[in-house]
Amino acid sequence: MATASADLKIRRRLGRSELMVTPIGLGCWQFSKGRGLFGNYWTVLDDGEIQRILGLAINGGINWFDTAEAYGKGESEKALSKGLQNLGKSPGEVVIATKWNPVLRRSSSISGTIDTRLQNLAPFPIDLHQIHNPFSLSSVKSQVRAMAGLVHEKKIRYVGISNFSRGQMERARQELQKSGLPLVSNQVRYSLLDRRIEANGVLEAAKDLGISIIAYSPLAQGILTGKFHDDPQLIKSRSGF
């Protein structure tokens, strides 16, 4: 039987991109340092603990990391970059994904915020830039056009989405096709406790269209590991519960 470390030597193509990633990536919401609307959902981590987590991920074979503008108002991006540099990683050695926060904003803020994203993550480039959710004041068409513009300006490599329905995903893909670009991924909640994408058409459409599903909370934020059953006191340490 293959071991977990052996499995992480595998590289899978992300959608119809040239990005080759391990089957498991590391989500970096927990690097928010208590900032932002949901920054206190997690226990606040210091730089040393963040670097330890990143080191464990890298030593285990993980080669890609997912962060977002909304994670601590950019603190997660900064912490990720700092930690990777301290661990001796250079641009090109890891794959970086981040997300634009669309809530109550128009698509014009995609180009208006990209330089901050790049500054926070420097020297690492943005391999995948995602629309975090479908709650922008602008249409999907307008948002995707703005994202395509960033690709053509070489500020990002590829475009993804997150929390999009089947219809929204299909519209985003169609609009990107007009610019000659693929829609690489749709990042959605997916675990043994939440299998909605199997019934609502998202998973089926993604397979048909060559769009990778990036599953977030695949262990239901630790519930499926059994650790809360083994030690109920851990629940009290989670401010998000």
Descriptions of predicted regions:
Residues 1-94, 152:
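N-terminal binding-site loop/beta-alpha segment at the start of enzyme catalytic domains
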Residues 14, 26, 50, 57, ...:
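Conserved, mostly hydrophobic/aromatic
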Residues 43-57, 106-122, 140, 169-173:
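Short, acidic/polar
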Residues 92-104, 129-131, 187-190:
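A short, structured active-site edge motif that brings together acidic residues
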Residues 121-137:
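Active-site groove signature of glycoside hydrolases
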